[in-house]
C-alpha cells in the first residue's frame, strides 16, 4: 500500500469513527433531554378511578438523574376523570349569610346595552357559579322594551353568564324559554327550557349543548317549571314541573333525567295542595324543594324526592312565621306542617327555605303585602314543630323602602360541607314605576357563613329618573 493509500484509509476510518461518535452524542443528548422533561408518568385510569402520578427514578451506570425544581417548563399533568356529583357531604353549619355578588344590571342599563330580564337564578358547576335569567329579546334602551311586563312571548330566551357579569350584548342565549331550570351533573349542563303556546307549550331538555329530549303540555294550561336550579345526584337530575290552574287544582309532576333523557315521571303525592316555582337543594341521598302555593296557602309547600325509587312526599313548612307574600301578620299567621293555612293563599311569590335539624332558615319579603324589602332569619323548631315562631339571627338584605321580587336557593360544594346560598331578584319598572314602559331586574346574592357579619341593605339602586323610558 503506497503512502497515499495509507493516508486515504486512515482518513476514512477516522471520519467514520468521528461520525459514529457524533451520532452517539446526539442520541445521548436526546435521551437525556427526554428523560429530564418527562418528570411524571400517568397511567390510564381503570374503572373510572384516578391513578396517582409518581416521579420516575432512572438509574444508568450508578448515575442518578435528579430532576430540577423551580423550572419554567410546564409539567405533564394527569388528566382529571370527570365524575357525577353526589352531594354526599353534610350541610354546612352557619350563623347567617354574607354578601357574595351583585350585578347592578339596571344601573348599568342607564348608559349601556343590557338585556331586559326577569326570573333570574344562580347555579354552579365544579369550578364556577353562573347567573341565569329569562331575557325579553331586547335591551333596555330599545323600543322593544316597551310592555315587557308580559311573562310569555316567543322571543324570550334563557341567558347565561358567569356570576357577576351583567347580561350584555355578548351574552349567550342558551335556549328559547319563558320558563326554565338549569343544573350541572358533574359532567355537563342540563337546561330545561319551556316555550310555546299557553295551551300547548313544549319543554326542551338540552344536555351538553345538544337537544336530547322534549315533552309537551299535559294539561294545556301553561306548562311551567322552577325558575331556579334543578339538582343532580349520581347522574340523575330531577326537576319539578306544573301544568294547570294558577289559582286552583293543577297537575304537578317530578321528572327524572339522565344526560338529557327523561327516564321517569312521578306524580306529586302527599298533602301539598298546590305547587309551583320550587327552590330545590340536595339532601343526600334525596332532593328537597320549598315551593309556592298559589291557591290556598301562604305557608310554603315542601316536596321530598327520593332519587332511588322515584317516590314523592309533600307537606308544608312548620314555621308559623310563613314565607309567602301576601300573608297575614306574624301574630295571626299559622302553619300545622301538613296542610295549607288558607291565609291569603291566592297569589304568591317564588321563595326558599332549608332545614337545619329541627330548625329552618328562610327568606321572605319584609312587606306582608307587597314584593318590597327582604329579610332572612332562623326559626327555632321551624322544621319540626307546628306553628313555631321563635326567630333568631335576623338579617335585612333589602330595606323595606326598596323593591324585591323572586328569590331562590342554590348549593355550593366545599371541601368538607355543602353551603346554601340564595339570590334575590330586584325588580324595577312597571307596574309600580310608571314613568318607564319596561320591566326588568338586577340581582343580589348571599351565601351562608359560619363567621360574623354586619348590617346593611343592598337594593337595586338605580334612579328611575336617569333611566331610558
Swiss-Prot record:
Domain of life: Viruses
Cofactor(s) for this UniProt protein: Ca(2+)
Biased composition (Low complexity): 333-342
Reactions catalysed according to its record: Hydrolysis of alpha-(2->3)-, alpha-(2->6)-, alpha-(2->8)- glycosidic linkages of terminal sialic acid residues in oligosaccharides, glycoproteins, glycolipids, colominic acid and synthetic substrates
Name of the top EC class for this enzyme: hydrolase
Subunit structure: Homotetramer.
Protein name, UniProt field: Neuraminidase
Organism of provenance: Influenza A virus (strain A/Aichi/2/1968 H3N2)
Amino acid at each position: 500500500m503506497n503512502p497515499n493509500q495509507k493516508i486515504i484509509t486512515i482518513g476514512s476510518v477516522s471520519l467514520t469513527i468521528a461520525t459514529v461518535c457524533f451520532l452517539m452524542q446526539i442520541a445521548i443528548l436526546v435521551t437525556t433531554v427526554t428523560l429530564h422533561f418527562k418528570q411524571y408518568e400517568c397511567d390510564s385510569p381503570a374503572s373510572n378511578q384516578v391513578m396517582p402520578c409518581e416521579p420516575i427514578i432512572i438509574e444508568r451506570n450508578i448515575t442518578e438523574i435528579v430532576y430540577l425544581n423551580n423550572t419554567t417548563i410546564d409539567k405533564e399533568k394527569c388528566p382529571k376523570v370527570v365524575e357525577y356529583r353526589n352531594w354526599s357531604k353534610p350541610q354546612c353549619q352557619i350563623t347567617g349569610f354574607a354578601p357574595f355578588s351583585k350585578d347592578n344590571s339596571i344601573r348599568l342599563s342607564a348608559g349601556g346595552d343590557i338585556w331586559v330580564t326577569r326570573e333570574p337564578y344562580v347555579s354552579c358547576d365544579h369550578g364556577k357559579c353562573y347567573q341565569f335569567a329569562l331575557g325579553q329579546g331586547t335591551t333596555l334602551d330599545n323600543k322593544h322594551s316597551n310592555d315587557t311586563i308580559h311573562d310569555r312571548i316567543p322571543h324570550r330566551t334563557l341567558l347565561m353568564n358567569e356570576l357577576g357579569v351583567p347580561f350584555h350584548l355578548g351574552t349567550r342565549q342558551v335556549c328559547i324559554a319563558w320558563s326554565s331550570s338549569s343544573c350541572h351533573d358533574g359532567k355537563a349542563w342540563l337546561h330545561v327550557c319551556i316555550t310555546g303556546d299557553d295551551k300547548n307549550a313544549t319543554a326542551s331538555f338540552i344536555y351538553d349543548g345538544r337537544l336530547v329530549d322534549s315533552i309537551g303540555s299535559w294539561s294545556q294550561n301553561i306548562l311551567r317549571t322552577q325558575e331556579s336550579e334543578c339538582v343532580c345526584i349520581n347522574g340523575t337530575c330531577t326537576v319539578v314541573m306544573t301544568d294547570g290552574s294558577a289559582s286552583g287544582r293543577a297537575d304537578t309532576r317530578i321528572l327524572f333525567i339522565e344526560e338529557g333523557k327523561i327516564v321517569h315521571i312521578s306524580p306529586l303525592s302527599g298533602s301539598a295542595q298546590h305547587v309551583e316555582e320550587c327552590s330545590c337543594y340536595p339532601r343526600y341521598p334525596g332532593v328537597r324543594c320549598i315551593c309556592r302555593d298559589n291557591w290556598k296557602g301562604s305557608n310554603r309547600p315542601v316536596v321530598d324526592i327520593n332519587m332511588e325509587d322515584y317516590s314523592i312526599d309533600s307537606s308544608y313548612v312548620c314555621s308559623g312565621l310563613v314565607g309567602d307574600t301576601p300573608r297575614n301578620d306574624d301574630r295571626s299567621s299559622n302553619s300545622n306542617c301538613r296542610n295549607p293555612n288558607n291565609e291569603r293563599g291566592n297569589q304568591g311569590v317564588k321563595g326558599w327555605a332549608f332545614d337545619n335539624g329541627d330548625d329552618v332558615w328562610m327568606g321572605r319579603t319584609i312587606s306582608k303585602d307587597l314584593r318590597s324589602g327582604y329579610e332572612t332569619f332562623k326559626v327555632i323548631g321551624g322544621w319540626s314543630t307546628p306553628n313555631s315562631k321563635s326567630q333568631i339571627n335576623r338579617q335585612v338584605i333589602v330595606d323595606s323602602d326598596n323593591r324585591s321580587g323572586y328569590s331562590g336557593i342554590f348549593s355550593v360544594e366545599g371541601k368538607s360541607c355543602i353551603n346554601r346560598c340564595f339570590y334575590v331578584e330586584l325588580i324595577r319598572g312597571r307596574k309600580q314605576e310608571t314613568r318607564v314602559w319596561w320591566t326588568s331586574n338586577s340581582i343580589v346574592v348571599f351565601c351562608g357563613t359560619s363567621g360574623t357579619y354586619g348590617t346593611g341593605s343592598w337594593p337595586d339602586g338605580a334612579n328611575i329618573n336617569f333611566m331610558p323610558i
